[in-house]
Amino acid sequence: MGGGDLNTKKSWHPLLQVNQERVWKREKEALEERKKLEELRREREQEREMQQLQRLQEEAGGKKRIDRVDWMYATPATTGSGSAAEMEDYLLGKKRVDKLLQGEENKEMSKTTQKSLVSLQNANSARDLAAKIREDPMLAIKQQEQAAYEALLRDPTRLRQLKMQAGIDTDTQSKDERRRSKEEKRRRHDRDEHRRRGSRHGESRSESRSHSRRDDRDRKSSWNEGSSSRRHDGDEERRSLKRHRDDQDRDRHRYERRLHDADDSRPASRSNRDRRDKDAVDESSSRQSTSYSRSRSRSPPARDYRNDKRLSSSSAFTRPSNGGSARNREEDEERKQQARQLKLQEMEQNARSMEQQRSSYVSKINAEEAEQERREAELRQKLIDARSKGHGDGKGNFIMDQQRKTFHDSVDLAERMRRDRARLQRVD
């Protein structure tokens, strides 16, 4: 029989696993309970601090807090529908509960009717809504802000000062505005000029049609006269050509004289005189075309009409251009010149940056090559010094010989031919 500790057989022994598990569970429960108590104590402290802060706020003049749990401690006489005697009679069985319930229902009905009347009285009508909108403080503030903004827009000096304070470049903006106004004025002038030119072309077309009809009649009459009129055609043609040249010279001198006068006068009347000059040129061209068509009466009528139209169109195309188109061309040339200069500057900057990069890269490569040459020279010098001193034999000498052969210090012609035998080819 083997001996042992009989206490381990007892159910109360602390070394038993069951007892240890029981102790562990109790300790765990105690720890959880302690945590809960600590959390509850912390919540109580927070509530106490909140109440103290609310009390200080009420003492400072803030909104008073309403306690919602006072009804729990109120007496039945103050909260119930009836008096304390009625409640006691109900408890003793002397009164029925129906009367109490009916009284409460009547009170509730009266309260609901009063609420409905109040809600009907407070209904939002159109007049009430208008009054509310009119008396809205936010709307009044917005209206004042809008009025102040409009007043600021009407005051350009104040607006410019605010822009300068905000850091906005007013000069560039004013330049843009001036450029836009100039462009708008030029477009408006071009539209007016085009409209006037269209009306003038309509009048000239009507006049040319009347001239063409008259020329047709003249050509028909001259065509029907017969051979008697054809004898004088050569003289008539020479006279008409002479008149044509005289008219051209006279019109050219008149146009140059008017242009000279227009340059000396105000710019505002320049467009009117240009229009009068153009009308004069148109009239002279139409007169020249009619005289030329009369001189060429021996050709068919349809051909003369086509020549007349061609001459009138050529005279219309040879009209002088106005000053606005010249200004436009000058502005376009200036813009193109500026763009070309900017492009050239950018190209020069790119070329300089590329040259700098190339020079830095070349200097870096040169430095690396110089460093490599220096290392090779040091190694070669070390080998030469070791050989001159006679250090090492056998394997060391063999390695140094191979290194010298690698660096071409002691390689004769036979060794080089032996190495290059694979690359040599026989030439027949």
From Swiss-Prot:
Biased composition (Polar residues): 312-325, 347-363
PANTHER family to which the protein is assigned, alphabetical: CELL CYCLE CONTROL PROTEIN CWF25, PRE-MRNA-SPLICING FACTOR CWC25 HOMOLOG
Similarity comment: family membership: Belongs to the CWC25 family.
Name of protein: Pre-mRNA-splicing factor CWC25
Keyword presence, Nucleus: yes
Key words, A-Z: Coiled coil, mRNA processing, mRNA splicing, Nucleus, Spliceosome
Basic and acidic residues biased stretches: 172-285, 301-311, 327-337
One Pfam family cited in the UniProt record for this chain: Cir_N
Span list, region Disordered: 40-61, 163-380
Record-linked InterPro entries: CIR_N_dom (IPR019339), CWC25 (IPR022209), CWC25_splicing_factor (IPR051376)
Subcellular location: Nucleus
Secretion signal span: none
GO biological process terms on file: mRNA splicing, via spliceosome
High-level lineage: Eukaryota, Fungi, Dikarya, Basidiomycota, Ustilaginomycotina
Complex formation: Associated with the spliceosome.
Known role: Involved in pre-mRNA splicing.
The keyword Coiled coil appears for this protein: yes
GO terms under cellular component: Prp19 complex; U2-type spliceosomal complex
Coiled coil: 19-65, 326-389
Transmembrane segments: none
